[in-house]
């Protein structure tokens, strides 16, 4: 039995929730997010809170209810406060710049890398070696950050590459003669 699913998701003022079968739409000041939930989950909206429980006939009902609760809580936080993800570029000549609706990266390749940003995600570069991603969809921000990091992952000898701001890169010792 899921302990996560037992806690209700409190809906703050200024947030609209629409339940249409298993499709839930949440609107707030930062935009609108929609998610389709698993059929094993039953969602009820009452007293500015969403409560979750399993449907009869499903073995994994409580597990799916806990997952649904965590996802919808992230959606509520996203449309009210939003999410940010910071990336750092470590290496000589590694630079980032915002070019329209894309992030331009100079990562030591023979060509510059342009990564388009999906709708709902904004990026800014406080310095040439920092990228800050902002948006309402937690999953989409994480995916864009992972895509940017995948162009040049931190290598284990000098630590050069694109890394998350809170990431600790374990470095190896060089080969001894």
UniProtKB/Swiss-Prot annotation:
An annotated GO BP: cytoplasmic translation
TM ranges are: none
Q: Which GO cellular component terms are attached?
A: cytosolic large ribosomal subunit
Protein keywords: Ribonucleoprotein, Ribosomal protein, RNA-binding, rRNA-binding
Alphabetized SUPFAM superfamilies for the sequence: Ribosomal protein L6 (SSF56053)
MF terms from GO for this chain are:
rRNA binding; structural constituent of ribosome
Q: What family is it from? A: Belongs to the universal ribosomal protein uL6 family.
The record describes the protein's role as: This protein binds to the 23S rRNA, and is important in its secondary structure. It is located near the subunit interface in the base of the L7/L12 stalk, and near the tRNA binding site of the peptidyltransferase center.
Instruction: Summarize the subunit comment.
Output: Part of the 50S ribosomal subunit.
Q: What is this protein called?
A: Large ribosomal subunit protein uL6
The organism encoding this protein is Enterobacter sp. (strain 638)
What is the primary gene name for this protein?
rplF
């Amino acid at each position: 039995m899921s302990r996560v699913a037992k806690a209700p998701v409190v809906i703050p003022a200024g947030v609209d929730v629409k339940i249409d079968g298993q499709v839930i739409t949440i609107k707030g000041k930062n935009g609108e997010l929609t998610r389709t939930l698993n059929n094993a989950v039953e969602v009820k909206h009452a007293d500015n809170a969403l409560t979750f429980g399993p449907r009869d006939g499903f073995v994994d009902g409580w597990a799916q209810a806990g997952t649904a609760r965590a996802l919808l809580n992230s959606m509520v936080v996203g449309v009210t406060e939003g999410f940010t993800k910071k990336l750092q570029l470590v290496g000589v000549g590694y630079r980032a710049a915002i070019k329209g609706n894309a992030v331009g990266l100079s990562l030591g390749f023979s060509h510059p890398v342009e990564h388009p940003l999906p709708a709902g995600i904004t990026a800014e570069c406080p310095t040439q070696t920092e990228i800050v991603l902002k948006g309402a969809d937690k999953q989409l921000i994480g995916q864009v950050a992972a895509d940017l990091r995948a162009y040049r992952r931190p290598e284990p000898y000098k630590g050069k590459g694109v890394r998350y701001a809170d990431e600790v890169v374990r470095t190896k010792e060089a080969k001894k003669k």
